[in-house]
Amino acid sequence: MEKTYNPQSIEQTLYQTWEEKGYFKPHGDTSKEAYSIMIPPPNVTGSLHMGHAFQDTIMDTLIRAERMKGKNTLWQVGTDHAGIATQMVVERKIAAEEGKTKHDYGRDAFIDKIWEWKNESGGTITKQLRRLGASVDWDRERFTMDDGLSAATQEVFVRLYEEDLIYRGKRLVNWDPKLHTAISDLEVENKDKKGFMWHFRYPLANGVKTADGKDYIVVATTRPETMLGDTGVAVNPEDPRYKDLIGKEILLPIVNRLIPIVGDEHADMEKGTGCVKITPAHDFNDYEVGKRNQLPMINILTFNADIRESAEVFTTNGEVSDVYSTEIPAKYQGMERFEARKTIVAEFEELGLLEEIKDHDLTVPYGDRGGVVIEPMLTDQWYVRTAPLAEPAVKAVEDGQIQFVPKQYENMYFAWMRDVQDWCISRQLWWGHRIPAWYDNDGKVYVGRTEEEVREKNNLAPVVVLRQDDDVLDTWFSSALWTFGTQGWPENTDALKTFHPSEVLVSGFDIIFFWVARMIMMTMHFVKDEEGNAQVPFKTVYMTGLIRDENGDKMSKSKGNVLDPIDMIDGIDLESLVEKRCGNMMQPQLAKKIEKNTRKTFENGIEPYGTDALRFTLAAMASTGRDINWDMKRLEGYRNFCNKLWNASRYVLMNTEEHDCGMSLSAEERANMEFSLADKWIESQFELAAKEFNAHLDNYRLDMAANTLYEFIWNQFCDWYLELTKPVLWKGTEAQQQATRYMLITVLEKTLRLAHPVLPYITESIWQSVKPLVDGVEGDTIMTQALPQFNEENFNADVVADLEWVKAFITSIRNLRAEYDIAPSKGLEVMIKVADEKDAARIEANKVVLSSLAKLDEIKVLANGEETPACATSLVGKSELMIPMAGLIDKDAELARLAGEVKKTQGEIKRIEGKLGNEGFVAKAPEAVIAKEREKLEGYQETLVKLEAQQETIAAL
C-alpha cells in the first residue's frame, strides 16, 4: 500500500476495471432473489448536482449491499429527453452560433440538430455518475426517446385513448407566452411581488339597487386587463349584503356586456368587497366557478398574451358559442397585456368607476425557463382522465403494497390523489414524443401507432390527406412508464419478469405528484402479474430532503451558492470557482456579490476530498425526509476518516504481511489460539456493528449506518484495538502474537466488506492487499464478496463487559493526568480499592495492557481498610482508582494556576449573565443566538464546579 491515501490515484482506474469486468451486471442466477432499483432519469442536458449525488449515493449503497448479499441485482440507468429544457438549450445554441431560429431549420431538420447535440453533449451526466462510483449496468442504459421507450409511450397513449381515458378538450392551462407552450405546475415559479389591488365599480343593470341603495357593486382585482373577458360576478349566497342580487345582471363597463351575478362559495364575505369578478378563460379559480354556474368562457388573449382583435366565446364544454359578441374595443386590439392594464385603469377613472387603489402583496407565476409571467390560457390540449387511474393507486398505498419512508409523505400523496385533476399531457414543442393522432381536412381525429395503421383501421383511401398532430407529449408522460418501459414492455420480457416490480424509488418530495404518483397510476394500469393482478412499480418510496447551503438556503445559480460534487471530489482553485459561479449568469448584476461571498467562504478554493469522503458525508447526513444544510467541515472530517482507515490498514499489513497469522491452522487448532481479551472484544464489537449496519440499511437510515461504521472503525478498531495490540506484538509470546495477527487481518477484511457499500473505492483498494493474507477468500473484487451479517457464535457479552472495564480504567488514568497536568509519559503508581472479585480478576488478567497503555509503574490492589496517602481519585465501575499525589505536582504552583482559571471562568459567567439579563439583547437577538449564549453559560458553570473540586483536592494534599 502507498504511504498516504490519495483518492485521485485509485478511483478512476478501479471504476474502469469494475465496468470492464462486468461486475455491475445482474449475475443472472434466477434461483436467487432479484433486487432492482430504477434510477430517476436525469435530464440528458444536465450535469450532476448535489441532489443527484445525494440520491445516487443512497441508491448505490443499497444496490452494493444487496449485491453482496448474493441477490441478482440490477440498477437500471438512463436519461430523460427533458423536452422543454433540451429544446431551449439547442435553440440558444443555434441563435448564438448561427443567428438562426428553429423555424429557419424547420421541424425535421431542427429535431435532427437536437439529436446531433444530444449525441455530442448528452454524456456529461453519465461520465459524472461514473465518478461517483455508481454501479449501474451501463449495457442496459436507456433514453426516454430511444426506440423501445418511444414504442412503449405510443402504445400507452393508444390504449388509453381506446379506453376513453385520453381525450382532447378545451381547458385552462399554464401558458408560457414566450415559449408558446403549456407548462406543468413544476415549471411555474411563484414570486412574491409588491403590487396593487384595483377596486372598480360595476354598474347594476335594469335599475337594480344594492341593499344600501347603490346602483353599482365594487369588485377588487389585481388583473384589470382580464375584465374584458368577464362573464359574471360571484357573491357568497350567505352574504346579507348581496344575496338578493343573485340572478340580477351587471352592465360590464367598456364592453357593455350584460353578465349575471351568481351565488358561489368561492366569494369570501370577509375578503375584499365580497364581490368577485369571474373570468373563466383567464383564471383557474374562475374557471371552476364558471363550470359550476354554466358561465361562458371568453378568451381575450393571443398566444403572445396580447389582446386579441376579436374575442373567442365558448360554452363551459369548450364549444364555440354566440351567446356574447366577440367584439373588443378597437383601441385595445393588439395591445400588450400590461399596457392594456394601465389603459383599462385609466378608462375606469375617466368613467368615474375607479373606487380606489390599494397596495397589495401578490404571488405572481413566472415560467422557470422563459422567465415571463405565465397566463392561464384556454387552449385545445390532450388530457388523461386520472380519477379512474388514481383509485387503485391510492389503494396500493392504503394496503401497504407501497410504503413511504418517512411515512408522513403518504398523507401528501393521499391529499393530492383524492382530489386529482385531469392531466394535461400535450406540449407545444418540437422535441419529444409526437402525439400519435392524425386529422383529416374536416378536423376528424384518428389515433393509432402509425399513419398506416390509422388508414387501415379506418379504411381511409390514399386520397384522404392526413396531418399528424404537431404537439408532443409532456416529458412526465414517458417518465411515468420508466420502471416497466425500460424492461421491455409491452413485450413480456425476461427482464420484466425478473426485475419488476423494483424494490425502492429514491426521489425528492417535490416530484411526488409529477412523477411518483403518475408512475404508480400508469404501472398498475398496464402491468399485471401472472395471476392478472396489477403490479406496483416499486415497493418503497424513499423521500429525501433537499441539500441546502451552509446557511439553509436553496442552492441556485442566481444565489451563486451551488456546489458541484465533482469539485469536491477533484478540488478546484479559487479563481476557477469564482469564474464558474459568476460566468454565464442570467442576472449578471448579482455577480459582484456572489464573487465576494465565494472569496470569503472558500479563501483557498476547494481541496480534493475524493469520492468516498463525499459519499460518506452524504450518507452520514441522510436522515430520512429532512433537508440537509451542507457542511464543508463534515466533508473534511470524513476525509480524515478515510485517512484513518488507510493508515490503520497499513499498520495491520505491516504487522501481518510475511508473518504467521495462523491461516494454515485447522479449525480445531484455530479455536485453541491464544486470543487476548482485546482480540475477543474486537470480534464481538464487529458482530454488533454488522448487526446495526444491516438493520439501519433495511430501515433506510443511512445516517445511522454511516455512524455505526464511523464509531466502529475510528473509535473501537483504530483508537482502542490497534493500541491494545501493541503490547502483545511487542512483548507477547509467539502464540499470542499469532492469534493477534490473525484477528487483526480477519477483522480488517470483514470491516472492509462491511464498509464497502458506502466507501467503495478505498475498501476495494485496501482489500486487494488484504485478500492474499486471509484464508478462504475467493474472487477478484470485494464487490462480490459477502456482506457480513451478525454471527452470534463470535459474540461474547462477558468479553465486551471486561474490555469496557479495561477501557474505563485506562481512560480514568488519562483523565486524571489531564486534570492534574501530569505528563502522559511519566510512570505512575496506582492503587485500587476493588469492588468485587470480578474487578480483581480483571486487573490480574490485564496487568500488562493496563500498565502499557496507561503508562503505569505499579498497580497495587489495596486490602480492606488499608490506609492511603493523599490521592487523586476516580471511579471505575464501583472500584475506586487512586493516584498518590506526593511529589507529582508543585502544590502551590498548581493552586495558583487553578485560582487563575477560576477567576477567568467566573468572569465569563458574569459577562454572559449580564448579556442574558439585558432585556434589549433578549428582545432583539435571534432565538439561535440566545440559545448559544445559554449553552456557553452552562459550559462555564460546569467548568467552574470541576475547577473548585480540583482546588479542594489539591488543598488537602
Swiss-Prot record:
<dbReference type="Pfam" id="PF08264">
    <property type="entry name" value="Anticodon_1"/>
</dbReference>
<comment type="subunit">
    <text>Monomer.</text>
</comment>
<dbReference type="InterPro" id="IPR001412">
    <property type="entry name" value="aa-tRNA-synth_I_CS"/>
</dbReference>
<dbReference type="GO" id="GO:0005829">
    <property type="term" value="C:cytosol"/>
</dbReference>
<dbReference type="GO" id="GO:0006438">
    <property type="term" value="P:valyl-tRNA aminoacylation"/>
</dbReference>
<keyword id="KW-0436">Ligase</keyword>
<dbReference type="GO" id="GO:0005524">
    <property type="term" value="F:ATP binding"/>
</dbReference>
<feature type="short sequence motif" description="'KMSKS' region">
    <location>
        <begin position="554"/>
        <end position="558"/>
    </location>
</feature>
<dbReference type="InterPro" id="IPR037118">
    <property type="entry name" value="Val-tRNA_synth_C_sf"/>
</dbReference>
<feature type="binding site">
    <location>
        <position position="557"/>
    </location>
    <ligand>
        <name>ATP</name>
    </ligand>
</feature>
<dbReference type="InterPro" id="IPR009080">
    <property type="entry name" value="tRNAsynth_Ia_anticodon-bd"/>
</dbReference>
<comment type="similarity">
    <text>Belongs to the class-I aminoacyl-tRNA synthetase family. ValS type 1 subfamily.</text>
</comment>
<dbReference type="InterPro" id="IPR013155">
    <property type="entry name" value="M/V/L/I-tRNA-synth_anticd-bd"/>
</dbReference>
<protein>
    <recommendedName>
        <fullName>Valine--tRNA ligase</fullName>
        <ecNumber>6.1.1.9</ecNumber>
    </recommendedName>
</protein>
<keyword id="KW-0963">Cytoplasm</keyword>
<dbReference type="InterPro" id="IPR019499">
    <property type="entry name" value="Val-tRNA_synth_tRNA-bd"/>
</dbReference>
<dbReference type="InterPro" id="IPR009008">
    <property type="entry name" value="Val/Leu/Ile-tRNA-synth_edit"/>
</dbReference>
<keyword id="KW-0175">Coiled coil</keyword>
<dbReference type="InterPro" id="IPR014729">
    <property type="entry name" value="Rossmann-like_a/b/a_fold"/>
</dbReference>
<dbReference type="InterPro" id="IPR033705">
    <property type="entry name" value="Anticodon_Ia_Val"/>
</dbReference>
<feature type="short sequence motif" description="'HIGH' region">
    <location>
        <begin position="42"/>
        <end position="52"/>
    </location>
</feature>
<dbReference type="GO" id="GO:0002161">
    <property type="term" value="F:aminoacyl-tRNA deacylase activity"/>
</dbReference>
<keyword id="KW-0547">Nucleotide-binding</keyword>
<comment type="function">
    <text>Catalyzes the attachment of valine to tRNA(Val). As ValRS can inadvertently accommodate and process structurally similar amino acids such as threonine, to avoid such errors, it has a 'posttransfer' editing activity that hydrolyzes mischarged Thr-tRNA(Val) in a tRNA-dependent manner.</text>
</comment>
<keyword id="KW-0030">Aminoacyl-tRNA synthetase</keyword>
<dbReference type="InterPro" id="IPR010978">
    <property type="entry name" value="tRNA-bd_arm"/>
</dbReference>
<dbReference type="GO" id="GO:0004832">
    <property type="term" value="F:valine-tRNA ligase activity"/>
</dbReference>
<feature type="coiled-coil region">
    <location>
        <begin position="890"/>
        <end position="956"/>
    </location>
</feature>
<dbReference type="InterPro" id="IPR002300">
    <property type="entry name" value="aa-tRNA-synth_Ia"/>
</dbReference>
<dbReference type="Pfam" id="PF10458">
    <property type="entry name" value="Val_tRNA-synt_C"/>
</dbReference>
<keyword id="KW-0648">Protein biosynthesis</keyword>
<keyword id="KW-0067">ATP-binding</keyword>
<dbReference type="InterPro" id="IPR002303">
    <property type="entry name" value="Valyl-tRNA_ligase"/>
</dbReference>
<dbReference type="Pfam" id="PF00133">
    <property type="entry name" value="tRNA-synt_1"/>
</dbReference>
